Amino acid sequence: MQWNQKESALLKDLKGQEQLCANKYSRHADAAKDPQLKQLFSQLAQQEAEHLNTITELERGIIPQMQSGGSKSQPTFTAAYHGESQEKQLDCFLCSDTLAGEKHVSQLYDTCVFEFSDARVRNVLNHIQKEEQEHGKWLYDYMSVNGMYQ
């Protein structure tokens, strides 16, 4: 499949954002204090790496088959923090940072879905966008349980 100039530029943009997200989640997994959050960030880093691979395939003109449904099973969280602490402040910062990134990437996919002429590509991008929205929901759930989201 050949891409026009605009489609190529958008794929390059998406690839850069997915790489940034994967790297950020990996680093944040190392920095997080709560083991639940470390696990969540590690899981999200893996999923962002999968998104990066999908976008790389698209760049090469290969339209991958997407699995039906959304991401993996929804994680559940228990409160790790009661009251304020430096650890909670750090984990809150890491969550806020990644949640802002998910919002940005989701908006980028929202734009891209309408810019590609091939319906199969739009379906792939839409699938990834749904997973990005799930990531945001998981971050919100963790923050909410720990009194970090107001």
Question: PLM features: residue spans?
Answer:
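Alpha-helical scaffold segments that form or flank carboxylate-/histidine-based iron centers
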Residues: 2-13, 35-53, 91-95, 119-133
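Arginine residue identity/basic-tract feature
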Residues: 27, 60, 67, 120-122
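Preference for long, well-ordered alpha-helical segments
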Residues: 101-150
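Conserved alpha-helical segments that form or flank metal/cofactor-binding pockets of metalloenzymes
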Residues: 35-73, 133-147
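Carboxylate-rich helix-loop segments that flank metal/cofactor sites and access channels
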Residues: 57-96, 100
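Absolute protein N-terminus
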Residues: 1-2, 150
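Alpha-helical bundle segments that constitute or directly flank the non-heme di-iron/ferroxidase center
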Residues: 2-33, 88-116
